[in-house]
């Protein structure tokens, strides 16, 4: 029989049921405190536009502020404007509902055990996200030009083989459309270049319209008025106008395989030679800081003094297959490139779109080098989709 002392010890050694062990209480997330709109606008204006799609998921009020004119006015006053990339994909010819995407930062889902996973070399953490399709939809095969935060679209096909003279402006701050005065002629896939506050629109006509007095239409952005520029000694059998660019004070225009150059200061047209048109005509192209670039089987830039194309060496870019679709764009003084990876199997229903940003360096007047800052897969789409537009705006 146990002694009373042992019993007491047993009793005293038992835990008091009324005294419970404190449990670790995980902190309950608190709602975002209500801040004045003007303070939120000031905060958002200092954040990169790449994060806006993520911030817009927080609440309706955030979404409203992120699309407000006041936010972008504040960004401009603070000197926080930046380039923003857009990509348009189409399916079919014409496609009544093309898909529009913009580049943004991925939500950070790389946390594991409280630590970030190491990102792969050359990765940026970016991806393409869809933006609402504007209503009414944009015409297929329209020409385009970016001016500040706006993208101007000229002409295109309303339906198969029916050209349009419609001009539409996409406001990339709010992703809304507004109409502008129509072209004086119906055009499909015209070339457009921005020069000193005006947009020069050329091409997109053929047949009986090819020798019209309106081969080039000029739109004054400030007054919203159209004018035109005739091309002297243009012969109809030269071919169609298909490319344009403004470089070194001259407006270059391809007519078939010929290239004409218009000197704005002297108001004079000259032949620019055949060499310029050979690579330019069959490739995607863009102008970056007064230099014309193109990509066909290699990256090239045009030397206006020697009037010839030179190959640009690019360091760090994966080798592109010959059958890939490629688009290049001016991305704040750098080159952005989109390309699609060919499907390894004919049975594949999707393909991957990749993006790279290339920093450009000109060590002397005879060379330009490219160095890839990052490249990665940014979107997966059905194989039936093709590139239509790739460009950047300033927001």
UniProtKB/Swiss-Prot annotation:
Segments for region (Disordered): 1-29
Pfam families (alphabetical): F-box, Kelch_FKB95
Domain of life: Eukaryota
Species of origin: Arabidopsis thaliana (Mouse-ear cress)
Protein name: F-box/kelch-repeat protein At4g39570
UniProt keyword list: Kelch repeat, Repeat
Biased composition (Basic residues): 1-25
Domain F-box: 29-75
